[in-house]
């Protein structure tokens, strides 16, 4: 293609994008989730999709594409046509954490996406099986130290936030826990409930029903303030391990991405629709029940800035502890 022809194509794209945004959407939108059904990300994505559909006038359909710590779904979206009809619902763990373990990934976690909008942030809780006969984090740490290599921990995959959390915990507290990686949070949590593994971390909403039923014992919320969903569970600071919070954000900031090159007008339209969806009274109630906090107010440029900063911070943590994906 000559330079002149390329220039005409570029100009045509710029001129066409406002018209495309005016008619967008005119067919169903696919919202890809990089984990299996039933986990906290899937639940949140389906809730958002149910509110976006009437606002946009088209169906928003969740498409679960689990694998590689969320990167199967991420790669699918990164390579999709940038027309606003394939979006990625994800968390900081997928974009900011595990890319540091995979320098040969077929996509770049920051440069290959348009950052559409934040949705919410949620707290995570660490829990164990009742058969361990411990009731708090201090008790679990003491038991793990007394029997090096005996206790294992469930994660949602190599490079997932839980994976990093337990590696950091092993380093900070001189533990020898083996990490068992599962395809997603739902499978990891099920393994803890069955007693196949000793301990795990998941969103408070994922753990709550099992904790209420006595199937799991909560050890600590991984924040500096208690969760409204599990108000009786102490924070990790109250449990006596404040240094843990200096090494990363262990919750689950959730956001929506689009393929790089998606027209700005479409990104802006989606951002506005997501912010509007988050103001729905039913949405607010369900988010509260899920232990999530609305953080949707940021413009796309601000979303990119915050996520890039968190990406850099996680890189520093991973280098500091010389963390390897195979650990």
Predicted regions and their residues:
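Bacterial N-terminal signal peptides
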Residues: 3-16
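N-terminal (or domain-start) structured segment
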Residues: 21-111, 150-152, 158, 174-201, ...
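Short, flexible turn/loop "capping" segments at secondary-structure junctions
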Residues: 23-26, 117-121, 145, 246-251, ...
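An extracytoplasmic/periplasmic, membrane-proximal ligand-sensing/linker region
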Residues: 26-28, 171, 175, 264-327
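Hinge/capping helix and adjacent helix->loop/strand transition within the periplasmic-binding protein
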Residues: 79-85, 100-187, 199, 236-238, ...
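A ligand-binding cleft/hinge motif common to bilobed small-molecule-binding domains
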Residues: 93-104, 167-172, 199-235, 315
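C-terminal lobe and pocket-closing loops
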Residues: 135, 207-279, 309-312, 326
